[in-house]
Design a protein with these regions (language model features):
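Short, low-complexity intrinsically disordered segments enriched in A/P/G/S/L with frequent Arg
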Residues: 1-10, 15-23
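Short intrinsically disordered, low-complexity coil segments enriched in acidic
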Residues: 2-4, 33, 157, 223
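Hydrophobic h-region of N-terminal signal peptides that target proteins for export
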Residues: 29-37
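Short, compositionally biased P/S/T/A/G/V-rich stretches that sit at domain boundaries
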Residues: 38-50
Length: 612
């Protein structure tokens, strides 16, 4: 099944507050609706050219959901601003990439494509360029404004030109509010917006009242007002006052949800964040549980994206939903887990998942081991407890609808690793042995073509045990695939993913390590391998992974890394022999990419099948 609005029609919206009834005609995976409907993000061809090896230049571009069936492409090059040369003898039909083996690399070059429909060439795409003597490298570099690295990044078209731009939060350090981890913030976070070409658009200092840590400073980049350009929604506080106590905690003072204009960084509007109240109301006296903040977006009415604000993870959870209409933020609904009967406690995750789990055209919110319907009412809860690992995807193709893969942090006698039905929360399968603390992000991906569906990997926090299961729960392996959080990605060709092993940093018994004064270190520019499961190395990247998505080029994914002074966007240079619509035009995938700018980093999942 598919969870993309460009691939299926929602049911009629009825019997829901604010619902709209509309009929849509769905043609070639693109929307053609007679009335208001969820509009796909405008994307251009995403041209990319990298000097892959020797005299070879890899060129890639996007296939779009609204391309006519049978569209083909001619590939062109211009050298030193000279006349165009057509490189493709025949239109390219079986892929959206091309290897140019004759480019004069001692001079500057540009590449572009022209779609061919019914034998006639159409308008050219934007161009990808390489300077003279570019050197061999498999990434594009976006230079930052100083010798710092990004902590988190958000992707979105900030100026409406069809190209994805970058919003970064810097510096790269992050302090956890937990006891034994917290330290006084040595610096303030700055939000910086860069165009796709590296030009700095604006910078905003969040000030001392937003402490230096992921959980204090969530942000999300999305087009909330439907004007074709993305905004930034984030937690803010006054910058002209200092609410730190003597130790450096910020446990008092105003807190806001702000929405910033993507082009300028100017605040469009702000409203109060979910109230802190008494810090102890959240489960401790020192601010850990009160300082767990998340933000996201969801198509709660099936038409326009709402901003979703979340406070609390381990005990109480509160959620507010807002709409940006006529440049004003208005509340849609609120939910308080303590007002349920019985109260819903201890079910939160370190992030948020958004998906249309009941196939009604409107999004639900997966908060961890509990879910809210689009109207802000509790849809279901599993009572598994706080999960570290949460993925929503079409895990098992034989089971209708979406599933949720869980790795549970709290100690359990069974089901610590499990897969649930996303519509109802019903456990489909789970391990029958005890687990102590399934930690970090695990991995969910089609790694082994011998088994249908997606394989699910999870590990104990101390590194004592590892499990790889099939989509149906069959145990495949108990080997360490790279710590608690290896990252899977489409890198070569076909439906099977490669993966990047994570660092083997395990929580061992005993006192927690004393971190350097200030914050957790961002990490050195480590070199990581890209591997096939039970296979060879097929790539290599440098830097700390801060993004993974189909950012440009064909349907394979790019890896975005942070090194001091720059972002690197690594792209595959392995020629593909197949073509697929850009993954960013899958609804579930696009929402996952947007949500990766806050909380735990979970690589995005598709709502439908990549290969039929």
């Amino acid at each position: 099944m598919s969870n993309s609005p460009w691939q299926k029609s929602p049911h009629s919206e009825r019997d829901r507050p604010g619902g709209l009834s509309h009929n849509c005609i769905w043609i070639l995976s693109a929307i053609a609706c007679a009335s208001a409907a969820q509009a796909p993000e405008r994307l251009d061809r995403g041209m990319v050219a990298v000097h892959a090896a020797a005299n070879k230049v890899y060129v890639g571009w996007r296939l779009l959901a609204n391309d006519p069936p049978g569209v083909a492409f001619h590939v062109y090059r211009s050298t030193a601003a000279g006349n165009p040369i057509r490189l493709s003898k025949n239109p390219v039909t079986d892929s959206t990439n091309f290897v140019d083996e004759a480019a004069p690399l001692d001079r500057a070059n540009q590449w572009w494509v022209r779609p061919v429909v019914n034998g006639r060439e159409r308008e050219p795409s934007p161009r990808a360029a390489l300077p003279a003597n570019p050197g061999e490298r498999q990434y594009l570099a976006l230079k930052l404004q100083g010798a710092y690295s990004a902590n988190k990044i958000g992707l979105g078209d900030l100026d409406g030109d069809g190209k994805l731009d970058f919003v970064i939060k810097q510096p790269g350090s992050s302090i956890d509010p937990g006891q034994g981890y917290w330290r006084r913030s040595p610096d303030t976070y700055k939000i910086e917006a860069y165009r796709h070409d590296g030009a700095l658009l604006w910078r905003k200092d969040l000030g001392w009242n937003i402490e230096l840590g992921v959980w204090y400073s969530p942000l999300v980049v999305f087009d909330f007002d439907g004007d074709g350009a993305a905004e930034i929604a984030l937690r803010t506080a006054p910058v002209d006052a200092d609410y730190r106590d003597a130790d450096g905690h910020v446990l008092s003072g105003p807190e806001y949800l702000s929405i910033l204009d993507g082009r300028s960084g100017i605040e469009i509007d702000k409203v109060d964040w979910i109230a802190r109240g008494a810090v102890s109301d959240w489960g401790d006296s020192y601010g850990n549980r009160a300082s767990r903040h998340l933000i996201g977006m969801a198509y709660l009415d099936g038409t326009r994206p709402s901003v979703v604000v979340h406070r609390g993870t381990y005990t109480t959870m509160r959620v507010d939903a807002y709409d940006l209409v006529n440049r004003r933020i208005g509340k849609r609904w609120s939910w308080n887990s303590d007002q349920e009967t019985p109260p819903v406690r201890g079910q939160g995750m370190h992030g948020m998942k958004v998906a249309d789990v009941d196939d009604d055209g409107r999004d639900e919110l997966i908060l961890g081991a509990a879910a809210l319907d689009d109207n802000g009412r509790l849809l279901w809860k599993t009572d598994l407890g706080h999960p570290d690992v949460v993925y929503v995807a079409d895990v098992d193709p034989a089971h209708p609808g979406l599933e949720i893969a869980y790795g549970v942090e709290v100690k359990r006698g069974e089901n610590g690793i499990s897969v649930a039905e996303a519509r109802t929360g019903r456990i489909l399968w789970g391990v029958k042995h005890p687990t102590t603390h399934i930690h970090d992000q695990g991995m969910l991906a089609d790694l082994d073509p011998a088994h249908p569906g997606l394989e699910f990997y999870g590990a104990e926090a101390d590194g004592s045990r590892f499990w790889l299961h099939t989509a149906r729960g069959e145990l495949l392996a108990t080997e360490d695939l790279g710590g608690n959080s290896p990252h899977a990605l489409y890198w070569d060709d076909g439906p099977v993913k490669a993966y990047i092993p994570g660092p083997s940093r395990f929580r061992r018994p005993g006192p927690r390590p004393q971190l350097p004064a200030g914050a957790r270190p961002a990490g050195a520019a480590v070199v990581s391998r890209i591997l096939k499961y039970k296979g060879a190395q097929i790539g290599e990247i440098t830097g700390r992974i801060v993004g993974l998505a189909d950012v440009l080029g064909d349907w394979r994914e790019e890896v975005i890394t942070a090194v001091e002074g720059e972002l690197r966007i690594y792209t595959t240079t392995i020629p593909a022999t197949s073509r697929r619509v850009a993954l960013m035009q899958d609804r579930l995938y696009r929402m996952d990419v947007a949500l990766a700018s806050m909380g735990y980093f979970f690589p995005p999942q598709l709502g439908g099948k990549l290969f039929e």
